[in-house]
From Swiss-Prot:
It is an enzyme of class 6 (ligase). Keywords: ATP-binding, Cytoplasm, Ligase, Nucleotide-binding, Purine biosynthesis. This is Phosphoribosylformylglycinamidine cyclo-ligase. It comes from Agathobacter rectalis (strain ATCC 33656 / DSM 3377 / JCM 17463 / KCTC 5835 / VPI 0990) (Eubacterium rectale). It holds the Pfam family AIRS_C. Its main location: cytoplasm. The gene is purM. It is found in: Cytoplasm. It comes from the Bacteria.
Length: 341
């Protein structure tokens, strides 16, 4: 008996690495030391010497049960973008620049072409956020996971000068909330999605006029990465006072996390367009509006608070980075929390 008889194919692992190398190479930054295959990824910090007090930021996340849709649709080239987005958006939300990323794939069976396709999405997410893919792990788990399934997670490290960390300090009554459009559901709440819709190829491949695409394509749309937009705002000389990445828990959980005691956020629901996919989900699943806003981003993936005098500069900077911003509310004095009006 050998290792392959037990369900672990070492040769498939080697082939996966060879196939993914070209994708990884496309993400390299000058600070990366060495190549793929070492025991650890090395990244020089010499480029941050101009910072007064550099602080490293880290984030880890996955794609949740969104991967189930990738299995059903046999589409694996974008789920890696989601893994990167969930991590680097958190780093950027604190004011940081993502530096490097590592991925972790657990699978029932290592199909090299599929693994390389997944990593191509990870690499694309890294390119969109300007960080290097310095390493990763593909773990074959025979007997623990079905052969055609996998889970994907990632880890991002970034840097920010301590004085530039976004903490919510300095928020005042009248500060303006600006939200950036999402691509759709992003990467959370898919356990509910899978209860609302029948999860089979026929259902997911059905075209819907109101969506302008198939249900599966709308649901699998990769999470938007806001790193470049937030950097553009910073480069425009705007101080972002507070920032919230709208993920699991929706508006009600994530917006209060950007606030300080004594400040409350007011969001106007009609100030921006809610994507059709959320309207369809609410209708087909008979999901109450409050539950939708307590679970999903409802069309806004990132919300920042800025001084009223900086609104125009902020909007222009976000647009220049390719994002779609909306003025969606304001900060008021009051108990820490959020009101949707």
């Amino acid at each position: 008996m050998d290792y392959k008889n037990s369900g672990v194919d070492i040769e498939a692992g080697y082939k996966s690495v060879e196939l993914m190398k070209k994708h990884v190479k496309e993400t390299m930054r000058p600070e990366v030391l060495g190549g793929l295959g070492g025991f650890s990824g090395a990244f020089s910090l010499a480029s941050i010497k101009d910072m007064e007090d550099p602080v490293l930021l880290s984030g880890t996340d996955g794609c949740g049960t969104k991967v189930k849709l990738a299995f059903i649709m046999d589409k694996h080239d974008t789920i890696g973008i989601d893994a990167v987005a969930m991590c680097v958006n958190d780093v950027a939300c604190a004011g940081g620049e993502p530096l490097f990323f590592l991925d972790y794939i657990a699978c029932g069976k290592n199909y090299p072409e599929k693994i390389a396709t997944i990593v191509s999405g990870v690499a694309e997410g890294c390119k969109q956020s300007g960080c290097a893919l310095v390493g990763g792990e593909t773990a074959e788990h025979p007997g623990l996971m079905p052969e055609d399934e996998y889970d994907l997670a990632g880890f991002a490290v970034g840097v920010v000068d301590r004085k530039d960390i976004i903490t919510g300090e300095g928020l005042k009554d009248g500060d303006v909330l600006i939200g950036m459009a999402s691509t759709g559901v992003h990467s959370n709440g898919f356990s509910l999605v899978r209860k609302i819709f029948k999860m089979d190829k026929e259902t997911l491949n059905t075209y819907h006029e109101e969506l302008g695409t198939t249900l599966g394509e709308a649901l699998l749309a990769p999470t938007r990465i806001y790193v470049k937009a937030l950097k553009a705002v910073k480069d425009a000389g705007v101080t972002v006072k507070a920032c919230s990445h709208i993920t699991g828990g929706g508006f009600y959980e994530n917006i209060p996390r950007m606030l300080i005691d004594g400040k409350r956020a007011v969001v106007e629901k009609n100030s921006y367009p809610v994507p059709p996919i959320f309207k369809m989900m609410a209708r087909e699943g008979n999901v109450e509006e409050q539950m939708m806003y307590n679970t999903y981003n409802m069309g806004l993936g990132m919300i920042v608070a800025v001084d009223p005098a900086d609104v125009d500069k902020t909007m222009e900077a976000m647009k220049s980075a390719g994002d779609t911003p909306y003025v969606v509310g304001k900060i008021i004095d009051g108990e820490k929390g959020v009101d949707l009006v």
